[in-house]
Structures are given as structure tokens and as C-alpha cells.
Amino acid sequence: MTTCHRPTHERRFTNVRGHPPASRYAQEDARVFALAVRAISPLEDADIAQVLAITRPRELARGQFLLRAGERACEVGVVVSGLLREYFVMPDGTERTKAFGLSGYPTGSLADLLSGQPSKAFIVAEEPTRILVADYADSLALADRSLAWRRYGERLTQLILLVKAEREYELLGMDAAARYERFSARYPGLEARVAARHVASYLGITAVHLSRLRRRRRYAAAALRTRLKAS
């Protein structure tokens, strides 16, 4: 049976009763975390303190994994800084990017958590990343005794389903150019932070096709500037 792999040096937050975290770094973690979860469901300070009591900070260097395929997913978390990428590896070794996790985004492979089976996905840091994580079992126990966190879990699940449906529509109902435009609007500046091949795999196209789309966009922008100057 696969087991969870966690760094042994991690410590939980000390503000069990709602006292402020001990360091400025921890204060910023808590601030970003609170903003992220409150964007999904209204939560009081006491609710935030409850969940911070079961979380611990984790730092990942670029290229370090939060989760590898074959491991058992057992943690949930929120990205407080940096960038994560979730992807699958095909039999030929090709990577297919499923999602990006920016600051404020929830992280953890929900499907693998629910199934209890070895993970099919990898989650890797694309740049130095800091996250707050909690054991999935602890989060379930908190939801059992807290109506506020149970509602949060329900709303998060609904949000994940909506995002999944939107992603399916993009891949099945939109052409590559439209997908690229939507990606650029949703993730401004992200292209400069990750390799082009990862953006291409997220869009379901080749890196060569992505290069063509970028070139067309540059030409269109240049033509627009020319028309504006002439008007």
C-alpha cells in the first residue's frame, strides 16, 4: 500500500486559539490563506483560526514535487506564493499539463484524494513556492464539527466542478486560437513564468502551433498600433 510522504521537520501554526502567528512570514501566509478561502465562502476569524491550527507551511524549490504519480494523495493546501503545475505523463514520456496553481489557489489532487488510489498526477513547483498544507483527514474531521467549513467544502467542490466543465468546453468546443486568448486573459503574465511547452500542453497544441499563435498576436497588435497612429 502506498503511503504519504511528508518532510519530518514541518511544524504546525502556533495560533491555535486565534493568536497571531509568531513571524511576519507566517502572518503573510495566514493573510493570503484567509483571502483565498474567503473568496470561496464567508468565514469568520474564528473559523480561520480553526483551520490554521491544523495547517503547516511548506517551501518547495523550483522542480520540487508536492505530489508524484504513484504516491497516495493525502494533503490539501493553498498556494501562498510561487507557482505549481499539475500534469500527467503519457506512456511515451510526454507531459500533459492539467492546471496551474498560482498564489491563492487551492492545491491537492481531489480525484486522487477521493479515490484513495495511488495518484495519477504530478504536482511540481515551477518556481520557488510556499504553501500551507493540511492532512486531508484533518480537514474532513474539521468539516464534521464545523458547519462553516462543511459549507466551504461544498462550495469548493462546486467551484472545482464548474472549472472542470469550463476546461472541457475549452478543449472540445473552442479552437486553439480562442483557447489561447482565454488562457492569456485568465492568467496574465503566466507565459513569462513557465516554459512554452507547458503552456502548449495545457492548451492541447504543439509548441510550434503556440509559436504561430504568438506571432499572429504580435502582428495583429502591430497592425492595430499602425492604424491608431494613422487615425
Q: What are the residue ranges of the model-derived segments?
A:
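Cytochrome P450 core scaffold surrounding the K-helix E-X-X-R motif
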Residues: 87-93
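Cyclic-nucleotide recognition modules
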Residues: 97-154
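Glycine- and acidic-residue-biased ligand/ion/polar-headgroup-sensing regions
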Residues: 63, 74-87, 103-104
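Short phosphate-coordinating micro-motif centered on Lys-Gly-acidic
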Residues: 66-71
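Cyclic nucleotide-binding regulatory module and flanking cytosolic helices
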Residues: 2-56
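Localized chelating/binding microdomains
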Residues: 39-46, 76, 130, 167-173, ...
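Phosphate-/nucleic-acid-contacting segments
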Residues: 174-231
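Short, Lys/Arg-enriched N-terminal segment that forms or immediately precedes the first helix
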Residues: 33, 160-169
